[in-house]
Amino acid sequence: MVQRWIDWNTDTGSELVDIGTHKLHIACLGPPRKLGDPAVLIVPGLGSSITGWAAVRRQLAQVIRVYSYDRTGYGESDTGIEAPSSIMIAHELDLLLRKAQISPPLIVVAHSWGGILSREFLALRSGDVAGMVFVEANQEHTLDILDWRLLANSPVLTGVDRDKVHNIENLHKLNKEEWEIYQTTEASDKHQKQAALEYEQYPKSFPVLEAKSQLEQQPPILRSRPVCVIKGDNGRDFQKLFQAGIEKGNGSESERVAFEDVLTTWDVKDQALQRGNLKLSSRQKYFEVPFSGHNLQLTAPDAVVSGVKWVIENIE
C-alpha cells in the first residue's frame, strides 16, 4: 500500500509514488479540487522533462488544478527496467494516477511525442478524459508524411549550435530559477540516458497507435468533449538551422537540395498533420502561434494557457 503524504485534491507539492516496479515523481499546483472538477495533466514530448513547463504550470495554477510528472528516468523519478515504449509509458501513467488516487475528469495537455503518448493513455481511459490540448503534437502519420529526423540528422546541420540558432535562452518565458533548473535537469547524464532510450522507441510508437484507428472512429472517440490543437512554427526553426548550416559550408549540393525540398512543403503538411488530431472530437479549436518554434511551453506559454482555458469553457 502506498503511504500518501499529500492529498492530491487539496494540497500542493510533490512526491514519489510507488507504482509497483519503481517510483515516479508527481507534482500538483492550483486551487483545491472538488469531486468532479476537471484538472490538467501535462504530458511532455520526446526526451523532455516537466521542468520546461514551469511557466505554463504557474499560469494555469491560477485557475485550475495542474498535475505534472516525470516519466521513468527523468527528474526525480526512478529509472526503470522496461524499454520506454509508448504503451509502457501510458501504462505507467495510468498506474501512477491510480496509486495516487487522482480521479477524473482530466484535461490532457500534450506536446510533440506527447501527442502519441497521450492518445495511448486515451485508449486506456477514454471515459476519464474531459478534453485535450495538442501543442505541436505528433500523430500516427507524422513520420510517414513529415519525418523531421531527415532534417535533424542531415549533414547540412553538422556542427550547428541548435540552441544558439533557436535563441531559446532569450525567447523563453521562464523565470531565472526555473530556467536554471530546466537547463541543469536536461543536461544531466540521467536525463540524456533516458532521452536516448526514448529516441529508440520513438519510431515504433507510430504504427502501434495507427492500428487503433482512433482518427477514423465514428462517432469520435471523445464525442463532443473539446479538443484544441495549437501549431507553432517548427518549419521556421529548421529554416534558421539550414541557413546556419549553409553559412558553415555544410552539405553537398544534393544534400542541400534535399533539405530545401522538405522545407518547401513543410508548413502545408505540418498543418494538415496537426489538424488531424481534431478528428478525435466534434468540438474543435485550431490556432497557430507564428514565430514560436516547436517548444511553445518555453516560448509561448500564454498560447498554451489560452488553449486550456478554451477547453475548460467548453466542457459540458
Annotate the PLM regions.
Residues 4-23:
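N-terminal cap/lid segment of alpha/beta-hydrolase-fold proteins
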Residues 22-76, 124:
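Conserved HGGG/HGGXW glycine-rich cap/lid loop of the alpha/beta-hydrolase fold
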Residues 29, 33, 71-107:
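Active-site loop/oxyanion-hole signature of alpha/beta-hydrolase fold enzymes
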Residues 52-54, 77-83, 144-146:
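Conserved catalytic-core motifs of eukaryotic protein kinase domains, centered on the activation segment
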Residues 103-146:
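Conserved hydrolase catalytic core segment
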Residues 133-166, 204-209:
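Flexible "cap/lid" loop of the alpha/beta hydrolase fold
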Residues 174-288:
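Conserved serine/cysteine hydrolase catalytic core
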Residues 272, 279-316:
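Catalytic active-site module of serine/aspartate enzymes centered on a nucleophile-bearing elbow/loop
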